[in-house]
A protein has these predicted regions:
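Sec-dependent N-terminal signal peptides of Gram-positive bacterial secreted proteins and lipoproteins
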Residues: 2-28
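Sequence/structural signature of beta-propeller domains
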Residues: 27-450
């Protein structure tokens, strides 16, 4: 393994560029990094798409960047990671009115998509997905990423539509997976931002256990902002499953913008005990709901690396923090944390800035997968490319049309513009921003071990 690691890191040094961080704190001052960057290809796993857009004639590019875990260093010097997709290609819909009520929702251009685990391999000058493991329910049937039924635990209240505005229905087992780790028995653990849920599967992706609000996890977690549930996952030295809630909870619909903390959740899979800790988000967001965590990975001794990102002072930031829970106090299962009602002895997680990815050439919005190599010096980060797609609207009378400009009346089956006038529009797919289209993996080799 040592020879394999040395070979890989020599390759990284040869391909990378050295950048220096600004003196933000002790870690940031003392660390520089050598950076290697790869486009992740998945030629054998393109998603079938029957739309007419020529950009997707060969299918939709998959996105396996919603979570990352180190897998192995191989004798030939190659390195492998486990990674995971989210719920699949999707995009925002116009305001959707049915029976006089407005609903949020998403377009699902590939509604039969199954959230899947991937194996990402870096070998010589390339990175590629070499295998996949689709997720399956307890009856061994493939699940989907479609929304959960209204009223069920984990429902976001959304409708799932195709581009003809047909309702695609729901999936009680639907998952929007966002993090991955593996236990000592070879079982995978995944997290999801619908529920939020923690999911245990066997090595073939079959679901064995599922935890959610009032289903083994505190009910307060149901008050996550819709689609902002668990965003990252790791396993600590004691075998506890550690998940992070993407953004501050919205308790009673009142706290998402004002609560300066989000939650770290620790589940003991043997005793089922759950502990929660407060993670202090940065202070320079327009409001705290703009803070988004990306992933977490354990570095031992109740210490972790964690991605925090979002616009601060008007500029997009993608930051890696070193987080210490050793002295952190647990928080209650009610909403007191979000309302600022903390006990006198309250101690949140300690955080220290390790890397500002933007200072190392990272120009992508979503850093969502994080892993550390056995050398404790090389950090891997992958992006969520949103499957390389975005929703487009063609309107002969509006050259800058976007879905937010329109309302769809499902009872009358008509589109209306902002002036409440009936319009004839066409909705379909286009490629998203050039810097976002590809799945990418960066290796940051620090100049000192963690």
């Amino acid at each position: 393994m040592r020879k394999s690691l040395k070979k890989l890191l020599l390759l990284s040094c040869a391909l990378g560029t050295v950048f220096s961080t600004s003196p933000t704190n002790l870690y940031a001052q003392s660390n520089t990094a050598t950076v290697s960057h790869y486009i992740v290809t998945a030629d054998n796993y393109q998603l079938p798409y029957d739309g007419e857009e020529k950009e997707f004639a060969n299918g939709i590019n998959p996105g396996y960047g919603s979570g990352l875990m180190f897998k192995s260093l191989n004798n030939d010097g190659s390195i492998e990671f486990y990674c995971v997709t989210d719920r699949g290609p999707n995009g925002d819909i116009p305001t959707y009115i049915k029976d006089g009520k407005a609903y949020p929702g998403k377009f699902f251009p590939t509604p039969k998509f199954t959230p899947s685990i991937g194996i990402l391999k870096i070998d010589q000058n390339k990175a590629q997905i070499v295998d996949t493991i689709p997720l399956k329910d307890k009856n061994n049937h493939k699940i989907s990423g479609k929304v959960i039924p209204f009223g069920a635990i984990g429902s976001t209240g959304e409708v799932a539509l195709d581009f003809q505005m047909n309702d695609l229905g729901t999936d009680v087992n639907g998952l929007d997976t966002e993090g991955i780790t593996r236990d000592k028995d070879g079982n995978f653990w995944l997290c999801d931002e619908y529920g939020p849920f923690l999911i245990k599967t066997d090595s073939n992706g079959k679901i064995l256990e599922k935890y959610g609000p009032s289903m083994g996890l505190p009910s307060i977690l149901a008050q996550r902002v819709p689609n902002r549930g668990f965003e990252g996952l790791t396993i600590d030295d004691d075998g506890n499953i550690v998940g992070i809630v993407q953004s501050p909870l919205d308790v009673d619909g009142k706290t998402s913008k004002t609560a300066p903390y989000t939650r770290i959740v620790k589940l003991n899979p043997q005793t089922k005990e759950v502990k929660m800790y407060a993670y202090p988000v940065d202070k320079n967001y327009k409001n705290f709901s703009n803070a988004k965590l990306g992933d977490i990975t354990s570095i031992g001794n109740d210490e972790y690396l964690l991605i925090e990102q979002g616009k601060q002072n008007g500029k997009m930031q993608n930051l890696i923090y070193k987080v210490d829970l050793k002295n952190a106090t647990t928080v209650d299962t009610n909403g007191d944390l979000e309302y600022g009602k903390v006990p006198q002895n309250f101690v949140p997680a300690k955080k220290e800035l390790l890397l500002n990815l933007r200072q190392y050439g990272w120009n992508i919005e979503k850093a969502e997968g994080l892993a550390i190599l056995p050398d404790r010096q090389t950090i891997a980060v992958v992006n969520d490319n949103d499957f390389g797609i975005a929703v487009k609207v063609d309107d002969a009378n509006n050259n800058n049309a976007s879905v937010e400009d329109y309302t769809y009346d499902a009872d009358k089956k008509i589109f209306l513009n902002k002036n409440n006038q009936q319009v004839d529009i066409h909705i379909g797919l286009q490629q998203n921003a050039p810097e976002e289209q590809q799945s990418q993996i960066y290796l940051f080799k620090l100049n000192q071990k963690l």
